[in-house]
């Protein structure tokens, strides 16, 4: 776990069918964690289907890393309410990044792997991992756990560390 495997660029795109935690709605935000790093989106007031389109950056060091996210409802006078959590193994993304170097995919868009929903993961819809003009990108919807409903859409891009030959 010494040298970085790359920069992980996580775009929190949107949420769908989030749970109500205030009187009629919620004020959601997302905290994304990778190892001991964490980052937070802005709060979207009074919305159960928020659109963030926020890019959060992390240093990927562990090939067995798991991306974790928690969704909260911002409250003014008391502790923020939990609106669910989800996690995503980054092993498929990392293996595709390694494969890309072996098969020398560099231009255009090529789907190299699919991740299917199953009881062992939080993936809610079929997810694709593609090589787009030399960059490895995963588009994924995650089902929120420990709540009645809710999904979060992410776009995850693994960027090679500086000095790496593509």
Swiss-Prot record:
UniProt keyword Cell membrane, yes or no: yes
Segments forming domain C2: 1-103
Key word Membrane present: yes
Modification N-acetylglycine, positions: 2
Alphabetical GO biological process terms: abscisic acid-activated signaling pathway; positive regulation of abscisic acid-activated signaling pathway; positive regulation of GTPase activity
Matching Pfam families: C2
Subcellular location: Cell membrane; Nucleus
PTM sites of type N-acetylmethionine: 1
Main location: membrane
CDD domains associated with the record: C2_ArfGAP
PROSITE patterns: C2 (PS50004)
An example molecular function term from Gene Ontology annotations: metal ion binding
Superkingdom, taxonomy of origin: Eukaryota
Residues bound to Ca(2+) 1: 21-22, 73, 75, 81
Function: Stimulates the GTPase/ATPase activities of Obg-like ATPases. Mediates the transient calcium-dependent interaction of PYR/PYL/RCAR abscisic acid (ABA) receptors with the plasma membrane and thus regulates ABA sensitivity.
Protein name, per record: Protein C2-DOMAIN ABA-RELATED 11
């Amino acid at each position: 776990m010494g040298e970085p495997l790359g920069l992980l660029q996580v775009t929190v795109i949107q949420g769908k069918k989030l749970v109500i935690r205030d009187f009629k709605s919620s004020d959601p935000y997302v905290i994304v964690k990778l190892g001991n790093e964490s980052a937070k989106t802005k709060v979207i007031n009074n919305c159960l289907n928020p659109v963030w389109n926020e890019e959060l950056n992390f240093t990927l060091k562990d090939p067995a890393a798991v991306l974790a996210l928690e969704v909260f409802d911002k409250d003014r006078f008391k502790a923020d309410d939990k609106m669910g959590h989800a996690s995503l193994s980054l092993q498929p993304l990392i293996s595709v990044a390694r494969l890309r170097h072996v098969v020398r995919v560099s231009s255009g868009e090529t789907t190299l792997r699919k991740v299917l929903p199953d009881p062992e993961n939080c993936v809610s819809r079929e997810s694709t991992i593609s090589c787009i003009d030399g960059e490895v990108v995963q588009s994924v919807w995650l089902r929120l756990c420990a709540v009645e409903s809710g999904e979060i859409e992410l776009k995850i891009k693994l960027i090679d560390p500086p000095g790496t030959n593509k």
